[in-house]
């Protein structure tokens, strides 16, 4: 499970979360993440999952994302380990370049 709303964020924090997974991040958008960061604890790691990837790592990082979860952008049923490995290398390179 993940969070989207400020209420969900603070409920998770109240329950002891030491990081927040925003899912699906594509519904939040970078501008809303910037707004949420204004009220969240400054040391809270924020992970974006769903609708994120190499094409938008940079804009999410600028908005305050700490990290990302990649699902279907990395693996689709039936793909060989070789294909997944090449995708993973490409994703890591894009992340490193976005830093």
Cite the ranges covered by each PLM segment:
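Alpha-helix-loop-beta-strand connector modules within alpha/beta enzyme cores
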Residues: 1, 28-54, 85-99
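Active-site beta->alpha loop and helix N-cap motifs at the rims of alpha/beta catalytic domains
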Residues: 1-3, 8-24
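Generic, ordered loop/turn and secondary-structure boundary motif
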Residues: 4-5, 53, 75-76
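Catalytic cores of alpha/beta
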Residues: 7-15, 38, 42, 46, ...
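Glycine-rich phosphate-binding active-site loops on the catalytic face of alpha/beta enzymes
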Residues: 9, 21-29, 63-87
């Amino acid at each position: 499970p993940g969070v989207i709303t400020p209420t969900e964020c603070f409920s998770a924090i109240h329950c002891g979360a030491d990081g927040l997974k925003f899912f699906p991040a594509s519904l939040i958008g970078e501008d809303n993440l910037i707004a949420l960061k204004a009220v969240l604890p400054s040391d809270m790691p924020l992970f974006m999952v769903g609708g994120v990837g190499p094409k938008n790592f940079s804009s999410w990082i600028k908005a305050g994302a700490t990290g990302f979860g990649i699902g279907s952008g990395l693996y689709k049923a039936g793909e060989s380990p070789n294909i997944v490995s090449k995708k993973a290398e490409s994703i890591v390179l894009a992340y490193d370049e976005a830093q």
